[in-house]
Swiss-Prot record:
Main subcellular location: nucleus
Function summary: Sequence-specific transcription factor which is part of a developmental regulatory system that provides cells with specific positional identities on the anterior-posterior axis.
Location of the DNA-binding region in this protein: 262-321
Basic and acidic residues biased stretches: 161-171, 240-249
Protein localization: Nucleus
Compositional bias of kind Polar residues: 209-221
InterPro entries recorded: HD, HD_metazoa, Homeobox_CS, Homeodomain-like_sf, HXA10/ABDB-like
GO molecular function: DNA-binding transcription factor activity, RNA polymerase II-specific; RNA polymerase II cis-regulatory region sequence-specific DNA binding
Protein name: Homeobox protein Hox-D10a
SMART domains in the cross-refs: HOX
UniProt entry keywords in alphabetical sequence: Developmental protein, DNA-binding, Homeobox, Nucleus, Transcription, Transcription regulation
Amino acid sequence: MSFPSSSPAANTFLVDSLISACRTDSFYTGSSMYMPPGSEMGTYGMQTCGLLPAFSKRGEVNHQNVGMNVHSYIPQIDNWTDPSRPCRIESSNQDVQTTHSHQNIKEESNCCMYSDKRVPKVSSSEVPVYSNVAPESCPVDGPEIPVPGYFRLSQTYATGKHQEPYCHDPPDQSPTLIQLTPKPQPAPASATFADGESEKNKVPPEPATSRTPIQVESPKSATVEKICSPEASASSPELLQKEGKDSKSDQPANNWLTAKSGRKKRCPYTKHQTLELEKEFLFNMYLTRERRLEISRSVNLTDRQVKIWFQNRRMKLKKMSRENRIRELTSNLTFS
């Protein structure tokens, strides 16, 4: 901020007193002070304190040449808004009198405060010191109060207040020009929609062509597997066991893989495996570990499976022998 050398505002004490007067909502009671014209002082801080006029409204006379007379007080902060918001000062025909009563001062120093929604939008970098200044006479929740003698907001603020993404239009543009400007967005949107419909029409025939050979090949592969499976089952017992598990529904109820109730047996051994194990059981009911390993290799089973089979076979033999013994005893008692 530059001041002329002859001006008393160059003194730091006077500048500090001006700032403190704005902070504490009190009035400056100096006898006289020289105020330079608006062309020399263009800063925002001094403008809002009442030393300079605000931005003039479009179409009105510029107030830069109008100088301020000697004041006996510094008015209170009237408006804290964005520097680019259009405001105007009502010009009065009579000059400001050197003597004012406190009532007139309070009436003229009414401010135009905004609701809580508008206050945070003033950037802290622009107004770091005076952001919390608010007089008691100005309600916060209510609507804006027009000022009788100083700043008044133009009607452009009332229309743009309710727009959440708040932005200032450049001064050159007018609402008529904005309405007449063409909008090129609907044309590409319709073009993309037409392209999407054409692509949807082209896509369905492709899966149909890809599915048809799969359906033709699937029965061939199934027949090949059915032809190969009997040949392999005749050679190896493992495939026989797997084939017996897979073809459960095709087998009759009296088959050796299923029980009388129709459920699948717990350990469905093949005929070849059961025959070899039965022969070994008739020859020797209790196997050594070496003999059990040999049988497991020959029958293509594990050592544990052979061991469990012999245990179950012994329990079955014991049960059968007990039933036969009871039957013999009962038959002997009846005839005697």
